[in-house]
């Protein structure tokens, strides 16, 4: 559970930015000088370092060991360059990916289905898979998840193919190539993750993964997860310096 009301004007709140050429003490007097830090629940994070970590800096706030998902020991590991602007792990690409989950849930709502929660782990898995699939041009099959993939220009909506075109085929009794559509409307799926990579020779690579296996502390409502992400995103890119 995250307290979105914890934005304070001093270091006593859950969230604050303290910067400028000042000494800042926390948790027993550890001090920093001349930089800007994000403070979350008593722990300070250097903003420059967090930007370099891209989405992983955010994912680690929920699960400190999640970076291990990007080091699976497969050759696919090489395709993730954490924090790179065109990588699925860039903060901006993660922000864009969250819109994909919103769109998916709107489509599910039209079928009377429950909203998919966002899994922090599935966000990491989607980023890893999508980075690799930008080169492999196929599913890599490392993780046991349902997956939709698409390649196309940045202005293209992957749901035009995954949902609109495949639903039309399904409704006409053409069932040969409707797997993406069926993933979207599968009522056994309860959680999801989404990613966008900009490295593909065909433009962007879009990837969405699905599962019905929820882990405690890993799954959140869309409102809670997106709200927490945007607090972090805005704090990192538009810090309000206090003090």
Regions picked out by a protein language model, each given a short descriptive name:
Residues 12, 27, 33-36, 130-157, ...:
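Generic structural signal for short, solvent-exposed loop/turn connectors between secondary structure elements
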Residues 141-242:
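A well-ordered secondary-structure block
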Residues 23-24, 46, 136, 215-219:
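Short, charged/polar, Gly/Pro-enriched secondary-structure boundary elements
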Residues 1-56:
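Extracellular adhesion/carbohydrate-binding repeat motifs centered on closely spaced tryptophans
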Residues 55-145, 181, 187-199:
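Short, well-ordered surface patches within globular domains
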Residues 13, 104, 122, 172-176:
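Generic detector of short, well-ordered, non-transmembrane alpha-helical segments enriched
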């Amino acid at each position: 559970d995250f307290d979105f009301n914890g934005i304070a004007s001093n270091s006593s709140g859950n969230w604050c930015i303290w910067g400028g050429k000042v000494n800042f003490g926390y948790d027993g007097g550890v001090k920093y000088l001349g930089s800007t830090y994000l403070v979350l629940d008593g722990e300070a994070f250097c903003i420059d370092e967090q930007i370099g970590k891209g989405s992983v800096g955010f994912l680690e706030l929920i699960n400190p060991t999640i970076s291990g998902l990007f080091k699976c020991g497969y050759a696919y590991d090489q395709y993730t360059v954490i924090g790179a602007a065109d990588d699925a792990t860039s903060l901006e690409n993660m922000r864009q990916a969250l819109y994909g989950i919103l769109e998916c849930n709107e489509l599910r709502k039209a079928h009377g289905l429950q909203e998919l929660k966002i899994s922090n782990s599935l966000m990491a898995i989607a980023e890893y898979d999508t980075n690799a699939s930008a080169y492999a041009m196929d599913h890599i099959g490392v993780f046991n998840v349902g997956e939709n993939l698409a390649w196309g220009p940045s202005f293209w909506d992957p749901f035009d193919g995954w949902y609109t075109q495949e639903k039309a085929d399904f409704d006409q009794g053409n069932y040969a190539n409707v797997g993406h559509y069926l993933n979207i409307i599968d009522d056994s799926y309860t959680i999801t993750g989404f990613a966008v990579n900009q490295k593909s020779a065909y433009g962007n690579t879009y990837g969405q993964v699905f599962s019905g296996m929820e882990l405690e502390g890993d799954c959140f409502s869309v409102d809670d997860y997106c709200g927490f992400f945007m607090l972090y995103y805005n704090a990192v890119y538009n810090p309000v310096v206090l003090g």
